[in-house]
Amino acid sequence: MRTSRLTDLDLWKQLKAHAEKMALPENHLKHLTMAPERLAEFSIQALDMVYDFSRQRVDRQAIDLLMELAWERKVTQRFQAMTTGAVVNTTENRAALHTACRDFSKAKRVVNKIDVTAEMARVRKEIREFSEAVHAGQITGATGKPFAHVVVVGIGGSYLGTEFVARALAAYADKGICLHFLANVDIHNFGEIAEAIDPETTLWVIVSKSFTTAETMANANQAAAFMKEQGLDPARHFVSVTSKGSPGDQTGQDAPFPVLRSFHMFDFIGGRYSVTSAVGGVPLSLYLGYDRFETFLKGAHQMDVHAATAPPTTNMPLTAALLGIWNNNFLEYPAQAIIPYASPLARLAPHVQQLYMESNGKSVTAEGKPLGVRSGVIIFGEPGTNAQHSFFQLAHQGAPFPIDFIGVIKPQYDAFQALSRGVTNHQELWANLISQPRALAEGKESEDGHRSFSGNRPSSTILLEDLSPASVGKLLAFYEARTVYEAFVWGINPFDQYGVELGKKLASEIRSQMAAKNRDAGHTFENVDSISRFYLEKLMGKGNDE
């Protein structure tokens, strides 16, 4: 899709001028938030959620201009086209149909002669049957003992989303299954897991589309060797989530990597968008039970429908995306924090960090032309109130950055009602959640400079009724849709990630040097650049001239 250069748009120039106006003293948030109708005008309620942006540095004109920008860039049409199977991943000539994973309708979608609707139903059925058989003790390890540990072996999008959801819904977990994540190729990660599991009752879930990802295969091979050392047949303890026809998509002892069962993932679902596919479906169904996983999917689908069909002014992820553009390109904040006041959401920020930064960390348009403006910002976060004792000093009195606060009305554990200072723990949490956005927005003047707060620091608050599987699904899909909408405004492709390729290529060259040294102790690193050679010699020795 050809689009005009952003900075040439009259709307873009109007937004630039309006951002200067919003910097005037009379538009400080301490004044804007005093308006009686501020919350009603600058918040959206839908799907048992509230998206409150009343403490963003916007007025009605700013929102109207941003909505015009969304219309000009045809982002809603592009989002709808994405959900029906259009080729929106233009650099790889692929659809991006992560939303199909959680769509239980019979609407037919065909991509590259694949009936996507039928394939999604097939994969969900296979996941249900497998997870229920494991829970019933019908599928066991080599010694006949039921599985009690599940280890997800994957990296990046192959585990981060699953880890977020598993942590968020741990209160709903099957208490007979412990879930572990082996992502880092660092042997310390493997060693810690090896000490925590019972090999006889461990099921390894290898997640790799190609079954060639260096870190994942190094860990998978390490796990297979470990199981053999315990006298166990890896083929009875390994399942794969991979693409059709990959080396991991085969069972039996003659397979390149024998597995008990394989589940399919598809090239029209990117890793960072894949938690609702078999990538998350297999481990989460084992950990939570399939029915809870399906409820999670249906929550995500509700948000997908909202994101695709709600009018722009009442569309939560679209509004969040436009505010992201505003804060980044017009107010020039280089980062955003995600602060959930709910410890089960501790892994949300790392997931969104990868989702957003890998999707939108681009410098060229989908057509390969210079973008001309900054795209993605740095995403980081920590649960509240922990974050208040970590980086909130900087948030209040140092370099400002926008924050998404997330609050939950009903905690997963509501039986604990002891009072301290007259309130429960959950109420104490909320006292802080209510106060922090206000303090950031309003600030406080003081003759003592050390006690002066400039305020005017923007934030949004996302309110969830509970942390049920459906609510977590909605939250996941909210951030996915927000990420995609921002990309569509910029005209970039949020579904490729060529930025990771150069480092991988150089790592392959270094790996070859290491392998040569392992084969021949006399091998020298004379063909390697001097800086890399220093580290290789520190790690493996110099060779002939030692």
Curated annotation (Swiss-Prot):
Active-site residues (renumbered): E358 (proton donor), H389, K504
Protein's gene: pgi
Principal location class: cytoplasm
Similarity comment: family membership: Belongs to the GPI family.
Entry keyword annotation includes Transport: no
Name of the featured protein: Glucose-6-phosphate isomerase
Lineage of the organism: Bacteria, Pseudomonadati, Thermodesulfobacteriota, Desulfobacteria, Desulfobacterales
Species this chain originates from: Desulfosudis oleivorans (strain DSM 6200 / JCM 39069 / Hxd3)
Subcellular location: Cytoplasm
Domain of life: Bacteria
Reactions catalysed, as given in the entry: alpha-D-glucose 6-phosphate = beta-D-fructose 6-phosphate
PROSITE patterns for the chain: P_GLUCOSE_ISOMERASE_1, P_GLUCOSE_ISOMERASE_2, P_GLUCOSE_ISOMERASE_3
